[in-house]
Amino acid sequence: MVVLNPDTNHPVSNPCGWIPPISPDSTPIPEDVSASSRAGHGIGVLGMIWAEDKAQVLGAGGKMLWHVPADFKHFKDTTMGSPIIMGRASFLSLGQALPGRRNIVLTGSREFTAPDVEIAHSLEEALELCARTPQVWITGGAKVYREVMELGLADLLVVTQLDMTAMVPPMSTVAYAPVIDPVRWQLDLTRSDENWRPKSGDAAWRVRYYIPR
């Protein structure tokens, strides 16, 4: 399968674990003070954005398992102009920094460098780089999503659901979307798609928005 960079529409050589996401036209803070602000970072809205199949699979074997161009465009439109925070593997899957956004890469390596990106060695450091920013997006991978969820830092979840079950290669390590706890999160019915959007590439798709209870 050929995987395309969502901005350039060109093939990428190492599509490991990047998940194409989604978007709102505007992202109001659901509380007087956002979760990330309470943590001391002063970020207006800290959103997490991803795409998943019917089994909540994000990818497997270091690869994306689908090609849905309309969702790629939705991700680009949503994140344009805002910082994006991602793990090193997710960045490498893109093949390059995404233009029009601050690209912040999480890595434990002190030697890792890449053009047009900022390096952070912890989630805390990445959030500090974005202090007093109106909107920040977490764009992968599974480990980063899980850490943000466990710390209770996110203000908004934007989830693309794909009307498909991905074919996972045998013996592959599968990356799954984080669990959305219904005690903490509620579906925003005013913005979420009720019906599937038309098929694009491999699947029909819809966008679901979750806000804190």
Question: Positions of the model-derived regions?
Answer:
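Enzymes that bind and transform nitrogen-containing heteroaromatic metabolites
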Residues: 2-10, 14-213
